[in-house]
Amino acid sequence: MLTSDTLYGAIGIDINVDHIALCETNKDGNIVLIKKYPIHKENTKNKRNEELYQLAIEIMEQCKSKKKSLVVEDLNFKQLKTRMLYRPKKQNKTLSSFAYKKILEKVERKCLMNEVDVIKVDPKNTSKIGKEKYTKIKGLSVHYCAAYVINRRGMGFVD
């Protein structure tokens, strides 16, 4: 059940506090490439913004050169902030400094400017499914497997 946006496959990303895990698949939903983009939290704000900008360009170019759509999670930040009320202070600080929204906006903007489709999918249990279903079979980390699940959802596969 391919959508027209995923005729050649897709590229899914899982954005984490310290890195972005990328998983590219072919039209059949099989892994073609995995890649990790580190995010350096200790950089100054300007350096971090420049780094995120460069990552956005690199991810967009990856999609454009392969004629593949980008698949991302459609996260609800209001729910996340509500849940932060019940977490330890240190964890809240890490989540607050986490630039997920900033990264996503930069990547989406670059894709829009360069005519690369962005598909948003339900984020429910992507890491859990990736861990339980694919880590052993594929021999990959949870983050790569989460990117794989995100990717497959964007292509219309059900895991």
Task: Give the predicted meaning of each segment.
Residues 1-159:
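Positively charged, helix-rich recognition surfaces that bind polyanionic ligands
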